[in-house]
């Protein structure tokens, strides 16, 4: 596989996705980066991109609506007694898929949210003392309501850290919203993707091949140093209580390599690092109350960090 192959595949994905998704170029690109990096995504805002991506990949897709009464066994599965045989057998839960859409994940209590932890980190589930390996690729795309909504349970830090990206999906601008209305006026149905004529672009084996290629994308020592210095700056920032961890810096490295490959390059540039850092940091750093009172948010503070740290030449 060559850099141009990865880039061409991404362009085909984007072209097919455009049949369904209007705008949202960056959220879709971040979803593809997460898939090829082996990460998970937390979406805040309008959903819809995850189902489209799954349709383009020829992989299994499952959606779970998280609610306050959802139990861990509703996600992982449970043993069921078969009257005819007199034996228990495993009834697998919806986690046994390849792309899992966890809709409104912060509607469910922490115990249920944490049921995904092992699956997200280890790509396996332990049920009744038996280990069950999940099919590859396995990716969780979770949507959440903003924390000010009633009936929400904030995701615990351990759960947040499992997500490679937190992607903010904004409301559409005027031109994009007009295009959406035109499509619906002419009979568009977002719930019938087959009728739209979406063509699968990637197979599971192709995803695996792309991941192997991405591992060999070149990262110069200066780029590694840049990633480390940005992380260190977050820990020393007067606006931040909890800075980026080494794990976050590792995620920046891996995501930057994937983003470079999508651009048709076999090497990482500082701009690649700058592109992937905000969605990796925004759910990991904790701002001081004074910074929030000033009206700053995580993205503004991360933007400051990236502007302050010298870029390698």
Regions found by a protein language model. Give the residues of each.
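Canonical AAA+ ATPase core
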Residues: 82-87, 108, 112, 120-216, ...
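Walker B catalytic acidic pair
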Residues: 45, 103-104, 115
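Short beta-strand-centered segment that lines the nucleotide-binding/catalytic pocket of NTP-utilizing
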Residues: 44, 59-73, 128-136
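Walker A/P-loop
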Residues: 32-67
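Conserved alpha-helical scaffold flanking the Walker A/P-loop in AAA+ ATPase domains
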Residues: 30-33, 81-101
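P-loop (Walker A) phosphate-binding loop of NTP-binding proteins
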Residues: 46, 75, 143
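Pre-Walker A (pre-P-loop) alpha-helix and adjacent loop at the N terminus of AAA/AAA+ ATPase modules
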Residues: 3-46
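C-terminal engagement/docking regions of AAA+ P-loop ATPases
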Residues: 234-313
């Amino acid at each position: 596989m060559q850099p141009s192959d990865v880039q061409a595949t991404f362009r085909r994905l984007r072209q097919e996705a455009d049949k369904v998704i209007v705008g949202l170029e960056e959220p879709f690109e971040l979803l593809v980066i997460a898939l090829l990096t082996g990460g998970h995504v937390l979406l805040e805002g309008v959903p819809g991109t995850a189902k489209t991506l799954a349709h383009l990949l020829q992989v299994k897709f499952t959606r779970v609506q998280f609610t306050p009464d959802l139990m861990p066994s509703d996600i992982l599965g449970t043993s069921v007694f078969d009257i005819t045989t007199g034996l228990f057998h495993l009834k697998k839960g919806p986690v046994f898929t390849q792309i899992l859409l966890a809709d409104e994940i912060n509607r469910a209590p922490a115990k249920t949210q944490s049921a995904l932890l092992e699956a997200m980190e280890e790509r396996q589930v332990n049920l009744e003392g038996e280990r069950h390996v999940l099919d590859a690729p396995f990716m969780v795309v979770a949507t959440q309501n903003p924390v000010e909504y009633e009936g929400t349970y904030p995701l615990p830090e351990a759960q947040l850290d499992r997500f490679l990206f937190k992607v903010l999906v904004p409301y559409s601008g005027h031109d994009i919203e007009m295009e959406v209305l035109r499509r619906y006026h002419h009979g568009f149905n977002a719930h019938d993707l087959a009728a739209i004529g979406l063509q699968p672009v990637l197979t599971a084996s192709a995803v695996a091949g792309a991941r192997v290629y991405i591992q060999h994308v070149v990262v110069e020592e200066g780029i590694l140093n840049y990633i480390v210095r940005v992380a260190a700056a977050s820990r020393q920032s007067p606006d931040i209580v909890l800075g980026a961890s080494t794990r976050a810096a590792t995620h920046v490295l891996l995501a930057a390599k994937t983003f470079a490959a999508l651009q048709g390059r076999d090497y990482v540039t500082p701009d690649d690092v700058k592109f992937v850092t905000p969605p990796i940091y925004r759910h990991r750093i904790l701002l001081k109350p004074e910074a929030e009172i000033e009206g700053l948010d995580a993205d503004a503070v991360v933007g400051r960090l990236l502007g302050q740290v010298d870029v390698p030449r």
